[in-house]
Amino acid sequence: MGKEKSVRIGRQALLLAMLDEGEEGAILDELRASNWRYCQGRVGAMEPQKIVAAIETAAKRHEVVDGSLYRDMHALYHAILEAVHGVTRGQVELGDLLRTAGLRFAVVRGTPYEQPKEGEWIAVALYGTIGAPVRGLEHEAVGLGINHI
């Protein structure tokens, strides 16, 4: 593999998901300077299909992915599922356990390697709180998925 650029796609996605509104200015400037595409959003459900739908809708709406291209959608789905596994500690069906969740997400698409032949990559980051169905007793959780396009 080629030498990495100074901008790391997973780190950028994690920071974008974790920083509060108004704090992400420097990250957004870096993404724009690199001609990388991105989107952010929130999801309050733990059902995997709702998480996937929220992220997929945002990524299409902000033109991070082209919904008509299989390779774009395939890469996005794999990155989402990997991020969900991180947040849920591998137990994807948490919606059935009546867990509470408040997650922010970020999707970043770009070319993190100097070698152009390495192509584009996509990163999905999830950050927020998850816990038992007792408001106020949630804990933080984070997940990251990265896939080539």
Curated annotation (Swiss-Prot):
GO terms for biological process: L-histidine metabolic process; positive regulation of gene expression. It holds the Pfam family HutP. Signal peptide: none annotated. Keywords: Activator, Histidine metabolism, RNA-binding, Transcription, Transcription regulation. GO terms for molecular function: mRNA binding. Antiterminator that binds to cis-acting regulatory sequences on the mRNA in the presence of histidine, thereby suppressing transcription termination and activating the hut operon for histidine utilization. Homohexamer. NCBIfam families: PRK03065.1. Belongs to the HutP family. This is Hut operon positive regulatory protein. It comes from Geobacillus thermodenitrificans (strain NG80-2). The gene is hutP.
